[in-house]
Regions:
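Catalytic cores of carbohydrate-active enzymes
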Residues: 28-30, 43-56, 60-62, 71, ...
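Substrate-binding groove/exosite segments of carbohydrate-active enzymes
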Residues: 1-143, 154, 158
Length: 240
């Protein structure tokens, strides 16, 4: 029996390709059944609120479900901020009873790009203002070196998402740049002009150094990385 969050199917997609039409319907219902009291990886194996999963699913909601579904994202954003550790680390899944491990790149994905995507889809500035103090503490936990690059932090789980050949050093720089730029937008939105200016300047300097040190002429790579070129790094670097 299919169960999901208290919302309705609202988005639609149709084309002359039956396979794509079927994929849309399956994707829409897959999203729905991964939403109950929180977003989840999947209802069969993993029902915890991993923030990396939320970062993807919350955007899908805008195109496929009724606006009431955005309340689940609002709940997640506030919980994520409320469970911040005393050392400024933000971690997931939360709420939790026996887990406090940080996956830095998942956290950056949500606190920067995720929060701003939520605002762009809802106009809910109150939630941005609510989570901003936690975001500020987390952003400033990262140490920026004199050349503008951010000092690499593996966290408790050094994971670059699924797949092999993860250029973690390069990926970290790209994610922190993305986070800074979206954090600056949040700061500007709620009147934190000094933070917005700082984050914008820091992102600009990071990007300049990143291009000079990591671009090989054909791809972004850290000089100590020996594996195949990481497509994740290229993607995040481009969107940042």
């Amino acid at each position: 029996h299919e169960t999901g969050y208290n919302c309705s199917f609202a988005g639609s997609f149709e084309c002359d390709n039956s396979d794509l039409n079927s994929l849309w319907k399956k994707s829409q219902r897959t999203l729905y059944i991964t939403m109950r009291d929180n977003y989840m990886d999947c209802p069969d194996r993993e029902r915890a609120q991993w923030i990396g999963d939320v970062s993807n699913e919350m955007v899908e909601v805008f195109y496929s479900l009724s606006p009431s579904a955005n309340l689940l994202t609002r709940k997640c954003a506030r919980e994520f901020a409320d469970w911040q550790r005393s050392d400024s680390v933000m971690y997931a899944p939360v709420p939790e009873g026996n887990w406090k491990k940080e996956l830095p790149q998942q956290t950056m994905a949500f606190m920067g790009l995720g929060n701003w995507n939520y605002y762009m889809g809802t106009g809910d500035a109150a939630t941005i203002k609510y989570v901003f103090p936690a975001a500020k503490r987390y952003v400033h936990k990262w140490k920026i070196e004199d050349n503008g690059l951010v000092e690499y932090r593996p966290g408790a789980w050094d994971w670059g998402d699924w797949g092999d050949n993860a250029d973690m050093q390069a990926l970290c720089q790209a994610w922190y740049s993305t986070t800074l730029k979206n954090y600056a937008k949040q700061a500007d939105l709620i009147g934190e002009t000094a933070e917005a200016k700082w984050a914008t300047a820091a992102a600009k300097k990071l990007d300049e150094t990143f291009r000079n040190k990591f671009w090989t002429g054909s791809a972004y790579r850290h000089d100590t990385y020996k594996g195949l070129t990481d497509d994740r790094t290229q993607s995040v670097a481009v969107i940042s």
